Amino acid sequence: MGKKYVIGIDYGTESGRAVLVDLEGNEIADHVTPYPHGVIDEVLPESNVQLEPDWALQHPADYIEVLATAVPTVLQKSGVNPADVIGVGIDFTSCTMLPVDASGEPLCLKPEFRNRPHSWVKLWKHHAAQDEANLLNEIAAKRGEAFLPRYGGKISSEWMIAKIWQILNEDPEIYEQTDLFLEATDWVIFKMTGNIVRNSCAAGYKSIWHKQDGYPSKEFFRALDPRLEHLTETKLRGPIVPLGTRAGVLTNEMAAMMGLLPGTAVAVGNVDAHAAVPGVGVVEPGKLVMAMGTSICHMLLGTEEKYVEGMCGVVEDGIIPGYFGYEAGQSAVGDIFAWYVEQGVPAYVKEAAEKEGVSVHEWLEKRAAAYRPGETGLLALDWWNGNRSVLVDTDLTGLIVGYTLLTKPEEIYRALLEATAFGTRKIIDAFVENGVKVDELYACGGLPQKNKLLMQIYADVTNREIKIAASKQTPAVGAAMFAAVAAGKENGGYESIVEAARNMGKVREETFKPIPENVAMYEQLYQEYTKLHDYFGRGENDVMKRLKHWKETARAAKESMTLS
């Protein structure tokens, strides 16, 4: 048997990346395909239908474009014979979901529904189902639902049930016309194989499914809304299978489009951050993996089910079979830095960066690195896109304390970096206080590769060593590992994800170690962060929510005047 390869495809927020990997984890070729429609958050494509605040949609055709462009490109770049590619795996942002008809066609592609916002793909960061999430949590708490503590006491507006309920409330016809609500990752697998299978990772973390208990009861769904009583056996029906399972094989049509052979094994879908865990070679407890990009997802393995405040979920076999997989997260990290560079930086900074031939981020990072902890006089709460863990509240907003007339852009930049590190520390503390150990940190994604200052701050704030993934495409490599498992040993792949990760997972030799004097100062700053966190985040002062409410009321009044 000659040398064999697998392909992993990582569907992110703005683009899809395909990576061709050999069975030792060496990346042979990769290609990024930007989504032609990007994130749809203002106006629906091909129409003037305006979207409300907090909406975030996508176009499902963009996902197929990734298969049609990125996969043939990596084959061409590498010169690898398609016959030597034994499997394909994908991972996806989640919960990114869409309604489809009985043939599996997205409703937004049907002319009669094109101008209806609820027919489109709802991206993970669609936050317009907050009212539904609030009511769901209230009803679940009143009923004493057993599932609630597994999700840190709150179900997020980003997840499947809240999004489905929003569709039912705001466009019941779209709900009625929907045969299935699918995670986008499961829909792409359906397009490749012709088989509808739901992966246990997304079902467990985003759809309130439990390996032992299944979905919540019909009585619970009836308590939410009588029309939802039969949701799980109708519009959420379909087999739920473990990660690494073979979903099927490439159809003739998709094989031709992708430049691969019909019959190539396809692994069930996965969630982007979770695929990164084996991608860095982590297959045992005590090692927290941070998938760092626009947001951060924190993942950890444990040997028993513990309840942790504000965690996104604990799912048996949710990340690595045989362990309980814990997930927590921050709703915005890279997005905050990008917002500041785009919206908050004065013209002289942009001009200076251009003159030096560096990006604005690099210019700011270089100058911010000259400051000691505490020297900026600033402290921020990292809630620009709400708070995922531990407060689970998308109505919270950002805050910076300590501005003066002498405050510089690089000081603000550093304060924002530090704020996101404090947010991660808050999550680590929650795990440790509830008996889930965190001994060391692993970081992957775009940010750790680009920003050394950020990683040193994280090491200092958490007082833990951080190892960095060798790959820039860790989730895609993780997806490729699951492809090797789906292909099976008999075809040159692996028997289990543990075996695949031990052979294919890689980290850099360079690590970030805490600097003792920085740790001491950051401990003091963290205590102040905690006071602000609890004051604004736990109900003592709801000014952020009032401001957001007044903003939305004023905006709605202005729009109604424009329409009249």
From Swiss-Prot:
Enzyme nomenclature, EC number: 2.7.1.16
Keyword Cell division among record annotations: no
Stored Gene3D superfamilies: 3.30.420.40
One Pfam family of this chain: FGGY_C
Keyword list, A-Z: Arabinose catabolism, ATP-binding, Carbohydrate metabolism, Kinase, Nucleotide-binding, Transferase
GO terms of molecular function: ATP binding; D-ribulokinase activity; ribulokinase activity
Enzyme class: transferase
Pathways per UniProt: Carbohydrate degradation; L-arabinose degradation via L-ribulose; D-xylulose 5-phosphate from L-arabinose (bacterial route): step 2/3
CDD domains per UniProt: ASKHA_NBD_FGGY_L-RBK (cd07781)
Gene Ontology annotations of biological process type: L-arabinose catabolic process to xylulose 5-phosphate
Cellular component, GO, one term: cytoplasm
Reaction(s) this enzyme catalyzes, per UniProt: D-ribulose + ATP = D-ribulose 5-phosphate + ADP + H(+); L-ribulose + ATP = L-ribulose 5-phosphate + ADP + H(+)
Protein family: Belongs to the ribulokinase family.
Record protein name field: Ribulokinase
Lineage, broadest ranks: Bacteria, Bacillati, Bacillota, Bacilli, Bacillales
